[in-house]
């Protein structure tokens, strides 16, 4: 029978292949993820807090196990529920979950379908507790809230999906807030496709800002957002909670008129040279019709190379820095696009294929937690020469390592690939995990 299953290569008929290798896995690096998740208390917290509205009196595969299975699968790039069927007896997955077989695709799908508003609140609790633990290891010097939205494409009749005119595509339009320094995903909310960027942004950010202000009273807080988030309600939330902000304003004739004094200076500077780049900065106090009081607006006027027209940038801010420093601070929010790209490409944030919006919201939150677990892993314990790498590269180099399980009466030994070129980084990461001293209580 083995002869029938063997396949010879046309390039070399003396080389044969089959999938009868036995107790092998290609995901030995997940042992590091498991060790880290245990060390920072995530596994214990999930078992304590996460439970769906399940009426069954007995489950072979309980909710916390299903939860962690999908987190590990997401980190290993097995995004689909169907992948569970192929991984049922994978020696690495069964070892890190401590069970003889994984939950099947129907079990995982039913698990997601049981999720509701209550489980969304449980995600909030889990993420708050995990932030406290992670900050006990390495506390931030200041917090930089980067606020943005993105499009998650849909291709069916999902509840809440719609055509979004900004992106010119159908989908959901979730709201995201990242730590602009570390890349941690601080908050995530799935919204209908028709929602405008700033819709509910103040209610979205207020609990998060208050959490940091309450737990870290002396921590400097900053917020950045593009013109889609230019709403007085968000300004006031920041001002009440002593959170400095720099939010772009859409250009209009009033703002351009107020900046005219600097535009005239730029015309004088460039009148004999309309080819080279030129720039000037300024500021003024401004009160829009919907604002309760005047606010500081800084601006930049630049003349691009080989262009005659000026380009204006207006930022409303509570920061006291010089205009050019505020502009430079705001422009740093471009890093957030990389965080969003990492979430969508590396952790499949677009896994919103259920007909139910609430189920899709829970799926998104689970993928967001997988993103955070890896991001904490990367910046706290990953080998130093790998900490700037993206998830796909780390998967290739450190997570997708072949291993053979050798079982004895008392132990299971995983014999990893002898020719792995990243043994040093593997052991360095493991040593870093052992050196962590998180405050779990």
Model-predicted segments: where are they?
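Basic, amphipathic alpha-helical segments enriched in Lys/Arg and hydrophobic/aromatic residues
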Residues: 349-416
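Dynamic "connector" segments at or just before major functional cores
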Residues: 1-196, 201-215, 378, 401-441
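Short acidic (Asp/Glu) and glycine-rich catalytic loops that position anionic groups and cofactors
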Residues: 9-15, 46-50, 88-91, 306-311, ...
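Short, conserved catalytic/metal-binding motifs centered on acidic residues
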Residues: 36, 69-70, 84, 104, ...
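Short amphipathic alpha-helical "interface-anchor" segments enriched in bulky aromatics
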Residues: 36, 84, 325-362, 366-377
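Structural motif
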Residues: 56-65, 305-306, 354-364
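An anionic, glycine-rich sequence signature occurring as long contiguous blocks
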Residues: 2-13, 244-345, 403, 428-441
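Domain-level cores of phosphate- or acyl-group-handling catalytic modules
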Residues: 196-254
